[in-house]
Regions:
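Bacterial signal peptide processing site
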Residues: 14-17
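A low-complexity, Ser/Thr/Gly/Pro-enriched, surface-exposed linker/loop concept
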Residues: 20-44, 70, 75-163, 195, ...
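Extracellular glycan-recognition/adhesion modules and their associated mucin-like linkers
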Residues: 46-60, 108-109, 168-174
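N-terminal export and membrane-targeting signals
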Residues: 1-5
Length: 225
């Protein structure tokens, strides 16, 4: 022991120990994270046609900063009707869209009726941001593409598996909307309007801006199998 101590002194080395009383700072609130986190180089995440797409390092959330015509999203990794001629009359709106491999159940207030009589279920696992609104859930039958790829029975293959990883703490921005990978999930928002969402496998939060009611963060509860 003495010999080891003498070697440390002679070489000028220092030994650090963890402070048992240290408490790491709490994560920033979603909108603060989006405002303050550094922006990543958008070129790395461009999939053409003015779309930025990424997946988180743990492969739990995949998102795109893209455009929508009505309910039709321009997603390069999924079949869609965004470019159909019949939709050209619809206005183009910038959006952020995220899918989860496993996800929290919907809060009752976020369930949107009977899906206009289509007999589809209104299910969680996706979040959509427009410049003035954020929502969680959608009308669909079956699993999300992320659930099919990276859920409990996922194939771990396909277009989503090829998306570039947005490192934890980084931000992406397109047409006034931002997304950031942080706190074991992803936050997306329109910082100037105070509208956004946070999604993770354990919980979600919708932030509707100062003129609307924001949902409190969801406690960790029921998830999809």
């Amino acid at each position: 022991m003495l010999a080891a101590l003498l070697i440390i002194i002679a070489t000028g080395c220092t030994v650090t120990t963890k402070d048992p009383a240290y408490v790491p700072p709490a994560p920033l609130q979603p909108m603060e994270q989006l405002e303050k986190a550094p922006l990543a180089d958008a070129k790395t995440f461009s999939s053409g046609d003015d779309v930025l797409s990424f997946i988180t390092a743990d492969r739990t959330v995949a998102c795109s900063l893209t455009s929508a015509r009505g309910e039709h999203l321009n997603l390069p990794y999924e079949q869609n009707r965004y470019s159909d001629a019949s939709n050209n009359k619809l206005p183009i709106v910038p959006v952020a869209y995220c899918e989860l491999a496993t996800y929290p159940a919907l809060q009752p207030d976020d369930t949107k009726g009977d899906c206009a009589g289509t007999h589809l279920g209104y299910l969680g696992g996706v979040a959509l941001l427009t410049p003035d609104n954020a929502r969680y859930g959608e009308c669909r039958s079956g699993v999300t593409p992320m659930e099919a790829a990276f859920g409990p029975k996922g194939s771990k293959t396909g277009p989503l598996a090829q998306l570039p990883v947005l490192a934890d703490g980084q931000n992406l921005e397109r047409n006034g909307l931002r997304c950031s990978a942080y706190n074991d999930g992803v936050a997306c928002g329109n910082v100037s309007a105070g509208v956004g969402f946070f999604v993770s496998p354990k919980r979600y939060e919708l932030i509707q801006g100062p003129a609307k009611t924001s949902h409190p963060p969801q406690s960790e509860g029921q998830k999809t199998p």
